[in-house]
Amino acid sequence: MKKKPKIPRAVIGTVLVFVVLLSVFMAGHDLWRQKQAQDTFEDLADLVTAPEDPEESQAESSAPEEFAEAQEPQEEQRNLSLLFEQNADCIGWICIPGTAVDYPLMHTTEDSEKYLRKDFYGAYSINGVPFLDGRCSLESANLIIYGHNMKNGTMFGSLKNYTDASYYAEHPTIELETAAGKALYTIFSVMKVQKEDAWYRFLTVDTETDFLHQIRYARECALYDTGIIPTYGQQLLTLSTCYGSSGGDGRLLIVAAKTE
């Protein structure tokens, strides 16, 4: 029997070096793409928070110190009309103060997951953009919003911190700003579920009994008791992201009720 020819060590070494270099390149490329995506979001945030009249802003900043101290701090307002003009799929801005969640919100009914891997401008993006479930409207009883659980903590990557009750205590409120204004939602349940969980089918409310049943379910599945029980008529908002093993069916839900 003829012996199989041995592969020269030099060839094996070359292949191994190539594989290592390719892995390093791919990892670096992913980091670069994530950085590009985050830069885009920061540019959008700067765009919507920039003063409409730079001269007026300069005048306010140069006001005498005694008058500046007397002025009450104004709540930051975003000029979302600039985003709406650039992309009609944008319906608002989602933010959890003090966290990395601070992004435009997209919505498409025909292709619900259009922004799963696209940036605000429609180009490919590993980060995607948070988007409202295509079955929802801004008047739905339960606004389900999706975002990626990025390893670097961007997008909805910081939501996993809500598995710790102390983090919830520091960040209990979600802000949703739309053309109608800013609404605040107070988190009342943090749940670990599967992607086919019944909660994803809860979009409308027919009766008070139905609403209370859903609230009971969310509180029973909660990782800890927040002490908050929503009342009938309050709109709910759910942030959904992947949780657990990569590519698995686990999902983390942050559920909040509209307070104002």
Question: Which ranges hold each PLM region?
Answer:
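Solvent-exposed, non-transmembrane regions of membrane-associated and secreted proteins
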Residues: L22-E260
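N-terminal Sec-pathway targeting helices
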Residues: K2-V19
